[in-house]
Design a protein with these regions (language model features):
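Cytosolic juxtamembrane helix at the C-terminal end of the final transmembrane segment
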Residues: 2-7, 68-86, 129-147
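Perimembrane loop-to-helix junctions flanking transmembrane segments
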Residues: 34-52
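A loop-to-helix transmembrane entry motif
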Residues: 49-67
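Membrane-helix exit/juxtamembrane interface segments
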Residues: 25-40, 72-75
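Alpha-helical transmembrane segments of multipass membrane proteins
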Residues: 21, 25, 63, 101-104, ...
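Transmembrane alpha-helical segments of multi-pass membrane proteins
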Residues: 13-17, 83-100
């Protein structure tokens, strides 16, 4: 239980870093016009924003892996004889939804580059972290009811 709280805190920090970086880019775009020119220091490689974004995505995703493990563990709990079929279906839906919606923004940003229209995809990761929070609370409730 303590370990899951630690991972939730780390995931929250990663999401805050992503949100802060996205807002910084958005503000620089509003102030200077071209996001790719405004935030790049002189002499830096042209794709430094994309590289920074990919690093932040990688950190956030690695911090979410324990949450995925907790979700799978919650599915195992839902498979116990006292659990209803609704528990199992709900666990599968939440886990699949969270995993797909974490991967999709990363693929979009890597394939299309960091354009201003992709900022919403980046910020959607924060929404998916919320899904993980809800899923973990649900898995813990199932554990209390079934165990």
């Amino acid at each position: 239980m303590e370990q899951s709280k630690k991972y939730l805190k780390l995931s929250s920090i990663a999401v805050l870093a992503l949100a802060f970086f996205s807002m910084l880019q958005l503000v620089s775009e509003l102030l200077f016009g071209d996001i790719n020119q405004a935030a790049i220091p002189e002499g830096a490689p042209d794709n430094i924003l994309l590289i920074t974004r990919i690093i932040l995505f990688a950190v956030a995703f690695l911090l979410m892996l324990p949450n995925i493990y907790i979700g799978i563990k919650g599915m195992r709990i839902a498979k116990k004889p006292n659990a209803s079929k609704a528990h199992i279906v709900w666990a599968i839906i939440l886990l699949a939804f969270a995993c797909l919606n974490i991967i999709e923004p990363v693929v979009t940003c890597v394939s299309d580059g960091m354009k201003s229209e992709n900022i919403s995809a980046v910020l959607s990761i924060a929404v998916e972290i919320t899904v993980f929070f809800e899923y973990i609370k649900y898995a813990m409730d199932v554990r209390k009811n079934v165990a």
